[in-house]
Amino acid sequence: MKKDDYLVEIRNVLKQNPFILVGVSDIEGEEICRFLKKEKIEFESVKLSNESPYWEEIPAEIKEKVNNIILSGRKVMSLCIGGNMPEAIFSIAAAWHAGPDEDKPYSPIEQLSLAIKKDISPYYRLIGANSRGFIYAMREEAAAMLKGFGARSKYKSILKDAGITDYDLEDYKQKVYDSGEAGMERIPETYRAGIGLVIREIRRKDRAAQGITQEQELQAERAVMKSYLIGSVTVVDMHDAKPAAVFDRLVETEKYGLLMLSANGGSYFLGPWSKVKKFEEHFPEGKVGGEPPIRGHWSGNYSRPLVVDFVESLEKVKDKSKLHEKSELFMKL
């Protein structure tokens, strides 16, 4: 389906005064709720875990309510909820694109904004980029936006929508910001500090929306300090830390590969799309997403030795005495 046809379909559903259910498991779900409130569109939200934002996890009373609404003949739209839901529900669950002709997939908030406003605000473009590819994708989106005519007005719009004040920006420049921060070189220097702060805030709010506590942030810092290398891939034994809290502190590793291993048997890999495809081929029951053909992420429940052995073979490691060299790409948040 072409983009214009798909957006017309969303608009047609919205014209029918649907019951809208928003799954909130991250910052995008929260921003969609704010957007709908601003547009004075009625909706109901349900809190879901970031690890399992699926229909199957929705409380029974809400499912019953939705089913009764469907039986009454009223249209139902769901946002940011995956899984096997009733076919009658019009679902905007994840990134959508029309194939190779599209520059990039649209996240749910971008789809909704295009359907209602016929445009995507600069801030929502960053939120969408965060959903597609986290920090790297946001940097690239900002670099693309802040060029040529209109760049300054877009920059001001981003700061305003992110809730960044002049005081916040000056404080950030004095205490934290380094103009030579890796990965920000493509963003014009005039806007670099402000965008750096906005990206940091989006990731902080995203982790908070996922339910990551201060104690889990500290757990992530401790785990990251013990990270090591298998070839060019950085490996972190997360124990009970959360993947987002670990990744945000090791973002520069994504260009080579980051493997996160949790205590409950979950494995998470982020890195170049070529390596993600290798994971997908070797572990077909895992889940894959991201921004092909540039970068992506894979996750699955496989034994630690199995995953580590695969990474060793992927990296063609022969001298295992150097497997535990420390990674130096730690970023203090």
Functional labels for PLM-detected ranges:
Residues 42-88:
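N-terminal small/polar loop signature for handling phosphorylated ligands or for N-terminal nucleophile
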Residues 25-28, 51-53, 83-85, 101, ...:
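Short acidic, S/G/P-rich loop/turn micro-motifs used as interaction or catalytic elements
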Residues 48-51, 98-102, 286-294:
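Short, acidic/turn-prone active-site loops that include or flank metal/cofactor-
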Residues 23-53:
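Short, charged N-terminal beta->alpha structural module
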Residues 22-25, 78-82, 96-98, 130:
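Short His-Asn-centered micro-motif
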